[in-house]
Regions:
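Juxtamembrane transmembrane-helix boundary motif
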Residues: 1-31, 44-56, 76-162, 180, ...
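Transmembrane helix boundary and interhelical junction motifs in multipass membrane proteins
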Residues: 35-44, 167-177
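Small-residue hotspots at the loop-to-helix junctions and early N-terminal turns
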Residues: 56-60, 186, 190, 194
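Transmembrane alpha-helices of multi-pass small-molecule transport proteins
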Residues: 62-76
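Short hydrophobic/aromatic, small-residue-rich stretches within specific transmembrane helices
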Residues: 63-67, 193-197, 218-223
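A general structural signal for well-ordered alpha-helical packing
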Residues: 174-175, 195, 199
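Membrane-helix boundary/interface segments in integral membrane proteins
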Residues: 204-209
C-alpha cells in the first residue's frame, strides 16, 4: 500500500508537492463540475507530469479514488439544481459498473508506458466526439424509455470497460453517450453523468486498491481540492449553459493539447 501523506509531512519539498496535489485536485473538481467529465482524463496526466508520480498504475488507481469522491460532491450540487435524470443514471451506471471491473483487470496487466500512450490516443478520440456534438441543444423532456433503454445499456457497458481500463471516470464518454442515446440537453447530461462517473470510479478504485495501487495521502489532497473545484465548476456551468458549444470547443482543445504532450512523452521514452 502507498501512504506517502504520512511520510513526507514536515519536509519543504513535500509541502510543495502537497500544494501541487491540492491545486491539481481543484482543476479536476472544477472540470467535473463544469462539464461532467474531464476530471479523470486530466487527473492522470496531472499526477504523472505535474505532481511527478513515477508509477502509472498508482496514478490511475489514485485518480479513480479522487475522481469518484469529487464526482459525488459535484452530484450533490447538481441534484439540488434538479439537473439529474435519475432513471437514466441508474441504467447507465449499473451496466457500466460491470464493464469497469472487467476493464480494470485488463488495464493492470498492461505496461504503464503503453497504458499512458493508449490513454492519450483515447483522449484524442474523445475530443473529436465532443466537437461533433457541440451544437446539439437536446430535448429538455428526454427520458429513458423502453425504446432507448438498450442503447443506454450498450453505451453504459462500453464506457465502463474503457473507464476501468484507463482508470478514468469516463465523463467525457458518458456525456456524449447520454446525449446520443436519449437526446437530453448537455446540462442534464452533465448532472446525470456524475452518477456513472462516481460508480465507475469506485469500481476501478476498489480493483486498484486491492492491488496496492492507491496513494491515500495524494487522494485526500485531490479530494479536498476537488470538492472546492466542483462547487465552483457547477456554478459556472449553470451560468454558461447557453454557451455550451464554446465551452465544449475550449475543453476539446485542452484535451488535444494534453494528449499531444502525453504522446510525445511516451514516444520519447
Amino acid at each position: 500500500m502507498f501512504f506517502r501523506f504520512a511520510n513526507r509531512v514536515g519536509m519543504p519539498t513535500d509541502v510543495a508537492h502537497m500544494l501541487l496535489e491540492l491545486l491539481s485536485g481543484v482543476v479536476v473538481g472544477f472540470t467535473l463540475g463544469l462539464i461532467g467529465g474531464g476530471g479523470s482524463i486530466l487527473a492522470v496526466p496531472l499526477m504523472v507530469y505535474v505532481v511527478g508520480v513515477p508509477n502509472a498504475h498508482v496514478a490511475i488507481g489514485t485518480s479513480a479514488v479522487s475522481v469518484a469522491a469529487n464526482a459525488l460532491a459535484g452530484l450533490g450540487y447538481h441534484a439540488r439544481a434538479r439537473t439529474v435524470k435519475w432513471r437514466c443514471a441508474g441504467i447507465f451506471a449499473s451496466c457500466g459498473i460491470l464493464g469497469a471491473l472487467v476493464g480494470a483487470s485488463a488495464g493492470k496487466a498492461v505496461d504503464g508506458q503503453k497504458l499512458l500512450l493508449c490513454f492519450a490516443i483515447l483522449m484524442i478520440g474523445v475530443g473529436f466526439l465532443m466537437l461533433r456534438g457541440r451544437h446539439d441543444q437536446g430535448c429538455a423532456d428526454a427520458q429513458c424509455t423502453r425504446d432507448n433503454a438498450p442503447r443506454v445499456m450498450a453505451f453504459g457497458g462500453l464506457t465502463g470497460i474503457l473507464s476501468g481500463f484507463f482508470g478514468i471516470g469516463g465523463g467525457f464518454l458518458i456525456v456524449p453517450g447520454l446525449i446520443a442515446s436519449t437526446h437530453m440537453p448537455i446540462l442534464n447530461a452533465v448532472g446525470t453523468s456524475l452518477v456513472a462517473v462516481a460508480a465507475f470510479g469506485l469500481s476501478t478504485a476498489i480493483s486498484y486498491m486491492l492491488s496496492g495501487y492507491v496513494d491515500w495521502g495524494m487522494a485526500a489532497l485531490f479530494i479536498v481540492g476537488g470538492t472546492l473545484g466542483s462547487y465552483a465548476g457547477m456554478r459556472v456551468s449553470r451560468r454558461m449553459a447557453g454557451a455550451s458549444g464554446a465551452l465544449t470547443i475550449f475543453f476539446a482543445g485542452v484535451i488535444f493539447c494534453v494528449a499531444t504532450y502525453m504522446i510525445w512523452r511516451s514516444l520519447r521514452g
